[in-house]
UniProtKB/Swiss-Prot annotation:
Residues 1-17 form the signal peptide. Interacts with the cell-bound hemolysin. Necessary for the extracellular secretion and activation of the hemolysin. Pfam families: POTRA_2, POTRA_3, ShlB. GO terms for cellular component: cell outer membrane; pore complex; type V protein secretion system complex. InterPro entries: Hemolysn_activator_HlyB_C, Polypept-transport_assoc_ShlB, POTRA, ShlB_POTRA, TPS, TPS_OM_transporter. The gene is hpmB. It comes from Proteus mirabilis. It is found in: Cell outer membrane. This is Hemolysin transporter protein HpmB. GO terms for biological process: killing of cells of another organism; monoatomic ion transport; protein secretion by the type V secretion system. Transmembrane segments: none annotated. The lineage of its organism: Bacteria, Pseudomonadati, Pseudomonadota, Gammaproteobacteria, Enterobacterales.
């Protein structure tokens, strides 16, 4: 009977969102599960964002064709007007916006202005190979202007890293548009091993163009190994992190990446192991991705009368589609849709904790804006996530007190990331500000809460945990990168702040802040990062529940092969 009471009490702790931060932290299974799922999703988002930014690193095509003009003269031309043929890609509005010719004494300057305006209308729509050809005057004395709008005759220069069929689908025989050409180049250059440039050559047919691609390809594989003490007290401080990626493994301009994070201290009694796999493939303006992650943990928790073994695992699989619906040399706007299935299993001394072990399926719709600004980059992502009943997702469990989690929740998330370089006192500084927030009217399962005290949120927390259904945090970092002989040295300071609120918690909004300072030293492919951080909770804690977070010293060493 005593065992049953202890177990029911534990289940209640896991299932109720109105607990205080420290009460939740005392039994950290749900924290481990949430951290594992959110860390793997963060790794996936960072890879996608990195590939998107990589597209804007390379200069896109910039072509300004020179129109064929008549030799300038002040004399009147022996014509009474003009007629235009061959136009199919311009609208009536485009044609009506052209400057009218004079009724009397048409000069070469008037004709040249008309040709330039026609060429400019094509360029405004992105048709970069359109040109105007002169025809002999007709029987009415009208000079002919014939628009050769141009089309793609063929594409040359593809290699294993540049699959022209997927990068430029259905482009052959179509009008050559700058946006289509830029999009294909951007998709090719999203792979770090590619540096693709393009030349447009005249084809053998009238109006035909040959797209000739050149690629300065580097090594397609990348391997990064790191060791740090960013782990948790319960499951292990020191971790070995490995990231391996390969560009175009199937010759489809595709991408595959594998991450593995494993704790190393006392692996037989306490551990946290996480693995994430991502695969993506382009098709014109679309990028399709599939991903999966698996993590497992184990640690021992001291209770009042005994020590228990807590362990569990999480599995996450999903598919995602991104579509770049607007782009230029300085910005990309993307729509994305993602379907994710999550399975969480938590155990208390071989007894499964059903209320903290849900199966969830979510569908997420988002819009992303990536903008290169003067001396900086701004990225914003807004998304709506809805839990659905697909793939065996569980129904919302019945809770007698009515304070249970909603397994059919809806939540809104906003993420912004701003990098800005600026000069001060004849030195260059870098400022980075990151905001993440979420809101849900529903009571979320614990794995969907927003946590302020994770290492990727407010810096400086080690023992306290603070999370909730709604909230947000802001991370600000000011750094000063400089070179010393062959070393790149970057000292930094950071200030973070955030608040969360749990549904049903009478305490309302609870917050915290963190202060940090760090130093990054890089020599060729090796990096050493040191950070000192201190976090504080900004709400009243009772003496029995009070947690004092010590000042943290974090160390990370990494090497890129």
């Amino acid at each position: 009977m005593k065992k049953k009471v202890v177990l029911l009490t534990l289940l209640s702790c896991f299932s109720t969102s109105g607990l205080s931060a420290n009460e939740t932290g005392n039994l950290g299974s749900i924290s481990e599960s949430r951290r594992a799922l959110q860390d793997s999703q963060r790794e996936i988002n960072q890879l996608i964002e990195q590939n998107r930014y990589q597209q804007l690193q390379e200069k896109a095509v910039n072509i300004s064709p020179t129109p064929t003009l008549i030799t300038e003269s002040e004399h009147c031309l022996p014509i009474k007007g003009v007629y235009i043929q061959g136009i199919t890609l311009l609208t009536e509005k485009d044609l009506n916006s052209l400057s009218p010719l004079p009724d009397q004494c048409i000069k070469s300057a008037d004709i040249n202005r008309l040709v330039k305006e026609l060429t400019q209308r094509y360029l405004q729509h992105g048709y970069i190979t359109a040109r105007i050809q002169f025809l002999r005057p007709n029987q009415h004395g009208e000079l002919g202007l014939y628009a050769i709008e141009g089309f793609v005759e063929r594409i040359e220069g593809g290699d294993r890293g540049v699959n022209t069929t997927l990068l430029f689908p259905r482009i052959k025989g179509q009008p050559l548009k700058l946006a289509t050409l830029d999009q294909g180049l951007d998709q090719a250059n999203r792979l770090q091993s590619n540096k693709v440039t393009v030349d447009i050559l005249p084809g053998t047919e009238l109006g035909g163009s040959v797209i000739k691609l050149s690629n300065q390809r580097k090594s397609p594989w990348h391997l990064n190994i790191a060791s740090d003490n960013y782990g948790q007290k319960n499951s292990g401080r020191w971790l070995i992190r490995t990231n391996a990626s390969l560009d175009s493994p199937l010759g489809l301009s595709d991408f595959v990446s594998l991450n593995a994070n494993i704790t190393t201290d006392n692996p037989n009694t306490r551990f946290n192991r996480a693995y994430t796999l991502l695969y993506s493939i382009p098709y014109g303006g679309f990028t399709f991705s599939s991903f999966g992650s698996y993590s497992e943990y184990q640690f021992h928790q001291k209770l009042q009368t005994r020590t228990v073994n807590l362990y569990g695992d999480t599995t996450q699989v999903g598919i995602r589609g991104d579509y770049a619906f607007s782009r230029s040399q300085k910005q990309i706007d993307t729509l994305n849709i993602q379907v994710t299935h999550k399975r969480i299993r938590n155990y208390f001394s071989q007894i499964r904790l059903d209320l903290s072990s849900p199966k969830l399926t979510t569908i997420e719709l988002g819009i992303n804006h990536l903008q290169i600004i003067p001396n900086g980059v701004l990225s914003t992502n807004l998304s709506v996530e809805k839990a659905v009943g697909w793939f065996g997702a569980e129904e919302t469990p019945y809770i007698a007190n009515g304070n249970g989690n909603d397994y059919r929740f809806t939540k809104v998330k906003l993420f912004t990331n701003w990098y800005q370089r600026f000069s001060l006192w004849h030195s260059t500084f870098l400022f980075n500000s990151t905001f993440l927030g979420q809101y849900s009217h529903d009571t979320l399962p614990g794995v969907e809460w927003l946590s302020l005290t994770d290492k990727n949120a407010i810096r400086g927390f080690d023992q306290s945990t603070l999370s909730g259904d709604n909230g947000g945090y802001l991370r600000n970092t000011l750094s000063y990168p400089y070179r010393l002989n062959h070393f790149s040295i970057t000292p930094r300071i950071g200030v973070d702040i955030g608040q969360v609120k749990q549904h049903g918690n009478y305490k309302g909004w609870q917050g915290g802040y963190g202060l940090s300072s760090g130093l990054n030293i890089q020599y060729q492919q090796a990096q050493l990062d040191l950070e000192v951080a201190k976090g504080e909770l900004l709400y009243h804690q009772t003496n029995s529940n009070k947690t004092k977070d010590p000042t943290q010293l974090l160390v990370k060493f990494s090497y890129l092969f």
